[in-house]
Amino acid sequence: MILELVKTQVQKDMVKRIIVKNHSYVPTHRSVGRRIDWLIYDDNTFPSECLGMIGIGSSVYPPPKDLLSYVGMTKSEYKDNFNSFANNWRYCLTKSIPNLGSQVLKQLRFHAPIEWNRKYGNFLTHLVTFVGGGKNGAVYKADNWEMIGETAGLPMHKSSSMKWHSK
């Protein structure tokens, strides 16, 4: 499995199609702020088959209280360090392959800080994600992300905060 950084309009259109077709509980491909996306390919097939996409973007503001507590920051300190946090804004797989989910997250943890620094000039120290209500975050737990709390959630469901950090 390989991650390919999304750069071209054709790749951006592919991300849009994957999200709209395979991510039904939040089917929008739009986001606000910074954003870096990758397409996920099976490197064991020729030609390589696209297995999904994953993306990070600007973190959330205001921050959830559990996140502030976990990282030991005030809201003001978080604001000062905002560009060191990224939100795993979307993760869509189009196929079910054993262990693929945690393999993708491992690659994301490797590539995200490099690309974040390259594109934005900031050191990425924290990746955060929100797991939709009714889901248990098993793929994140398999990659050793920690559940740090629950948010009030979107109007239709609660979500759990999970994070991975480089410390």
Language model segments and positions:
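Glycine-rich acetyl-CoA-binding "A-motif" of GNAT/NAT acetyltransferases
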Residues: P47-L51
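Acyl-donor binding region in acyl/amide transferases
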Residues: D43, M53-S166
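Short amphipathic alpha-helix that is part of the acyltransferase structural core
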Residues: M1-R34, L39-Y41
